[in-house]
């Protein structure tokens, strides 16, 4: 469960290292975000000499959460950390590589570009 003020790792090579969630998109007073949800975040740590800088406000899609994700067939997926992929206004990733396994639910939510870049789909 991701809520405002939650710190996230970045799972791509966009140039950001750490994010902090400041808003969850989708409803006016939505409290938590799960895998596949879009959040507004601020960059807390960035790689030098890249397009993204510290304290820049961006959009990101959640790809890993510590909270368990239960599927309809009974399988439970749980990751060790909270992570996101930086996206642009159209929903395409800003990075060209993704470093972690991605849940199958992202394909159903039309993040097909992120799924195609991922090394493994769980």
UniProtKB/Swiss-Prot annotation:
Transmembrane segments: none annotated. InterPro entries: Ribosomal_uL14, Ribosomal_uL14_bac-type, Ribosomal_uL14_CS, Ribosomal_uL14_sf. It is found in: Plastid, Chloroplast. Keywords: Chloroplast, Plastid, Ribonucleoprotein, Ribosomal protein, RNA-binding, rRNA-binding. SUPFAM superfamilies: Ribosomal protein L14. Pfam families: Ribosomal_L14. One of its GO terms (biological process) is translation. One of its GO terms (molecular function) is large ribosomal subunit rRNA binding. Its main location: plastid. It comes from the Eukaryota. Gene3D superfamilies: Ribosomal protein L14. GO terms for cellular component: chloroplast; cytosolic large ribosomal subunit. HAMAP family: Ribosomal_uL14. PANTHER family: 50S/60S RIBOSOMAL PROTEIN L14/L23, LARGE RIBOSOMAL SUBUNIT PROTEIN UL14C. Binds to 23S rRNA. Part of the 50S ribosomal subunit. NCBIfam families: rplN_bact. Belongs to the universal ribosomal protein uL14 family. This is Large ribosomal subunit protein uL14c.
């Amino acid at each position: 469960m991701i809520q405002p003020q939650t710190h996230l790792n970045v799972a791509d090579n966009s140039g950001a290292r750490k994010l902090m969630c400041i808003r969850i998109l989708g409803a006016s007073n939505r409290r938590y975000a799960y895998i596949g949800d879009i959040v507004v975040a601020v960059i807390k740590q960035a790689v030098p000499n890249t397009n993204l800088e510290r304290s820049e406000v961006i959009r990101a899609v959640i790809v890993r959460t510590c909270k368990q994700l239960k599927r309809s067939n009974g399988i439970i997926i749980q990751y060790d950390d909270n992570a996101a992929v930086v996206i642009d206004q159209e929903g395409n990733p800003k990075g060209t590589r993704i470093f972690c396994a991605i849940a199958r639910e992202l394909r159903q939510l039309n993040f097909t570009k992120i799924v195609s870049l991922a090394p493994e789909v769980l």
